[in-house]
Amino acid sequence: SSAALSSNVHGLQNGNDKVTALGDAYSAEMGKIVPLVDRAEKNAAAVLAQQKTLTQVGTSLRSVSRQSSDLLEVAETVSSLKLQQNAPAAEISAAGQLVMLTQRIGKSANEFLTMEGVSPEAVFLLGKDLNSFKEIAEGLLNGSQELRLAPAKDEQTRERLTALLKMYEETRTQARGILGNLQ
C-alpha cells in the first residue's frame, strides 16, 4: 500500500521502529525519492476518496451498455414495423436513426473510460445521443412537426414505441448518474 511504502521510505531517511536510517551517505538520493513517495501517497489518497463515485460510474456504464442492446432490439422492431406498413420515408428514416442511436449510446458507454481517463468525446456523444433518441422516439409516437412525423396510428407500433421510451428513461437515469458524477 502507499502507506507502507511511505513508512518504509521515511524510515530509510529518518529511521523508525521498523527501519534503520540509511545515514548521510544516501541523503541526496533519499532527498529525490521522498518527494516522489509523498506525491504517490497523496495521489493514492485522492483515488481512494473517489472510490465510491468511481464504482458507481463503472456500474452505471455497464448498465447503460447492457440496456442499449435491449433498446436496439425494440428499435429494430419499430423500424421493421414501419417498413412493413410502407410508412412515409421520414418515418422510416427516423426509425433507422433510432437503431443507429441505440448502437452509438452503447458504444459511447463502452468508450467512456479510456486508458487516459474519461473521453470527452464519448461524454459529449452520450448526452447528445440520449437527447436525440428521446426527441425522435417521441416524434414517432406522438408526431412532430419539426421532424415531419405523423403520430403512430397502429397499436403495435404505439406499444413498441411506448416500451422503448420506458426503457430509454431507465437508461437516461443511469447516464445522468454518470454525467452528474463528472461535474
Mark where each language-model region is:
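Hydrophobic alpha-helical segments
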Residues: S1-Q183
